[in-house]
Structures are given as C-alpha cells and as structure tokens.
C-alpha cells in the first residue's frame, strides 16, 4: 500500500463534498476556523457549497474537486465534509493514476466508504475512516475523536490499540480467536453496494471492519446475508464491528413484529464461521470516533477484546 506524508502544522487541507451537501454552510465556516486556529491552512473546493438534488453539486463537479485537490502541489491532505449520499456516483470519474502518483491523506466516513474502497483498489493508497470535516468544531468534536484523528494522521507510527472511549462502554466477543491482517471496510450499506461492480471490496485474508447507522436489525441481516452469499464472510480473516448507531428494532406495523437485536444478527452470521469477531469499538457513527487507517495491518484479539493497529498510516 502507498502512504501519504503525515499531517503537520502549516500544511494545507483541501476540502471536498463528494456526497450530500452540508445542512448549514456555517458548519464549513466553523470547521475551517477550527482547523486554521490549530495551525493548518484550508482551501474549500470550488463546488463544496453547491446543491444539486440529493447531492452537493453535479457528479462531474464533485469528482473534479477531488481530482483537483490531488493534482494541486499546494494541497497536502483532502478532507471530505461529510457522508450522506452520492459518493458512488463519482467513483468512475476519479483519476486513480493521479491519486497514485500524488498520494495525500484522504479522510471521511459513512457514504465516503465508496471512495475508500475505490481509491484503495485502483490507487493502492491508505485512506482514513474518520469524522467528516464539517464535524470539526469545539462543540461537536470530542476529546477522544480529536486525539485519535490528529495522532493517527500526524505521527508516522502505528496508532496502537484502539480503546473504548469510556470505561462504561461495552465490547462483545462474537467469537474468540486472534488474527493479524490488513483491515478493509467501512459502512456496511456501502460495502454491500460495491458488490458486483469493478469497485467490489476484497476481503480475502483481511479483517473486515463494518458499522452502520439507523439500520434496523433486519436490514443488517439483509446486508450480512448478501455478504455471505457473495463469499465475503468466508474470505475474511476476522471481523471488527464498530459502533452501530441506532441499529435497533423500530415500531412495527401489525403483522411484522420482531424483537431480534443486532447482536443476535451478528452472532447468527459470524459465530458459525469460527473466526475472531469483536463488536463495539467507537468506529462509526456516534459522539466518539476513532480514526482507522484502512489498508494497514492490524491485530484482532477477540479473546482479550482488543483491536490494535500495527502499522503506521502515514510516512
């Protein structure tokens, strides 16, 4: 895997909106001020503040912003504002050879999973599953999230063990065991959307990381059955399931009543595989979000309930 140079004070961050537009432009303004106060320079993409239907700007405009940020010599890192919807629309319009030849830090989560998968597959670049740029302000960015983000991007050393954000949080070992392998994945919905396309996730002998938000257990069941039928669960060396925000049974209409939990679903699909599987670390949607370098080697110990990044994500 190719690695970008570490993020240093004085570096310039290019901001793009590959998916949904920000609900409020003030989010981008506040985030820019926050990053500048920390000592970084910030360049907002030409089309970040546009809106077209479900997305921020047209497919061509959103892709052009990303290609431009990677091409510009004065840009050191590329931050996505947020997820939402629409990243998959532009993955066939990115210049992957350009990205390979000019590796830069690329961050984002949720819907940005489509870009992570595509960039890793066609450019071989380590990217970072991390909070969106629009979250960067004193009110929304927890100390846990901030420390993990700037340490992982700013220090050319392994991030080490990703720990619980609070002693009150719980972790569940779906199945015990230990494995060491590169980590791949992201938001489960987008992982499934990659199947059958040139950008399909490769889970062979890798730790599959996934999380999701607002997905009822039956929706998670649907996604995992899809991955099982595609052979991806059998391919994986182990499973790291992050925090799944609001993935609980909703109120059902008469005739469709179910109290099956997400943990029930995870156990049903993953326990029979007899591979290490750990659920509950703060990677995903929530108040606390650890930054995960995708593509680097990690150690999953489901017996001790630990997940450790063994390789630096930057140089």
Model-derived segments and spans:
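Internal helical hairpin/lid segments
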Residues: 202-262
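N-terminal glycine-rich "phosphate-gripper" loop used for MgATP/nucleotide binding
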Residues: 77-88
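ATP/nucleoside-binding phosphotransfer catalytic cores, i.e., glycine-rich phosphate-binding loops
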Residues: 241-315
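Conserved beta-alpha junction segments in alpha/beta enzyme cores
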Residues: 22, 26-27, 178-213
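Conserved anion/nucleotide-ligand pocket segment
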Residues: 124-190
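Short, acidic/small-residue loops that bind anionic groups at enzyme active sites
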Residues: 94-119, 126-133
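A short helix->loop->beta-strand "cap" motif at the edges of active sites that frequently abuts
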Residues: 74, 100-105, 123-125, 236-237, ...
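ATP/NTP phosphate-donor binding region
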Residues: 1-74
């Amino acid at each position: 895997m190719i690695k970008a140079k570490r993020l240093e004070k004085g570096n310039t961050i290019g901001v793009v909106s590959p998916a949904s537009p920000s609900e409020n432009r003030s989010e981008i303004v506040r985030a820019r001020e926050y990053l500048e106060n920390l000592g970084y320079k910030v360049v907002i993409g030409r089309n970040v503040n546009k809106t077209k239907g479900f997305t921020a700007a047209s497919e061509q405009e959103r892709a052009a912003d990303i290609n431009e940020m990677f091409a510009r010599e004065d840009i050191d890192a590329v931050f996505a504002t947020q997820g939402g919807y629409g990243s998959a629309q532009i993955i066939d319009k990115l210049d992957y050879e350009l990205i390979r030849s000019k590796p830069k830090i690329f961050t984002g989560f949720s819907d940005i999973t489509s870009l992570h998968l595509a960039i890793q597959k066609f450019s071989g670049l380590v990217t970072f599953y991390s909070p969106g740029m629009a979250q960067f302000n004193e009110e929304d960015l927890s100390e846990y999230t901030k420390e993990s983000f700037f340490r992982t991007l700013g220090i050319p050393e392994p991030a080490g063990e990703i720990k619980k954000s609070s002693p009150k949080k719980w972790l569940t070992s779906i199945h015990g065991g230990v494995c060491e392998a590169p980590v791949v994945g992201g938001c489960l919905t987008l992982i499934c959307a990659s199947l059958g396309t040139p950008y399909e996730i490769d889970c062979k002998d890798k730790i599959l990381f996934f999380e999701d938000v607002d997905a009822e257990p039956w929706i998670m069941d649907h996604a995992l059955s899809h991955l099982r039928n595609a052979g991806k669960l059998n391919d994986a060396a182990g499973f790291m399931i992050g925090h799944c925000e609001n993935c609980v049974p909703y109120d059902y209409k008469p005739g469709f009543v179910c109290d099956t939990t997400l943990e029930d679903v995870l156990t049903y699909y993953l326990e029979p595989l007899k591979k290490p599987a750990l659920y509950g670390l703060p990677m995903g949607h929530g108040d606390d979000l650890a930054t995960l370098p995708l593509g680097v080697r990690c150690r999953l110990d489901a017996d001790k309930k630990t997940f450790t990044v063994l390789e630096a994500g930057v140089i």
